[in-house]
Amino acid sequence: MSFFDYFRSKKNSTASVAKERLQIIVAHERGQREQPDYLPQLQQELLQVIRKYVQISDDMVQVEVDRNDHCSVLELNVTLPEK
């Protein structure tokens, strides 16, 4: 490394930025494949039940399944409207 290289800004090349973004997309897609088949239907049914009591839109309910070595966790996030 020369003296002048020390003061130059180190910019990420567009190729490395594109590679990093692609890795994020691939990881996200792999995560989607591991979800159970019943998850979309479960989300719709939960949405119907919640709508009996509160007016919400489809994007206000999120259902995810997290897995680790010993168990699976069903995570339900509902954004309730303000009154």
Curated annotation (Swiss-Prot):
NCBIfam families: minE, PRK00296.1, PRK13989.1. It comes from the Bacteria. The keyword Cell division applies. Belongs to the MinE family. One of its GO terms (biological process) is cell division. This is Cell division topological specificity factor. Transmembrane segments: none annotated. Disulfide bonds: none annotated. The keyword Transit peptide does not apply. Keywords: Cell cycle, Cell division. It comes from Marinobacter nauticus (strain ATCC 700491 / DSM 11845 / VT8). InterPro entries: MinE, MinE_sf. Prevents the cell division inhibition by proteins MinC and MinD at internal division sites while permitting inhibition at polar sites. This ensures cell division at the proper site by restricting the formation of a division septum at the midpoint of the long axis of the cell.
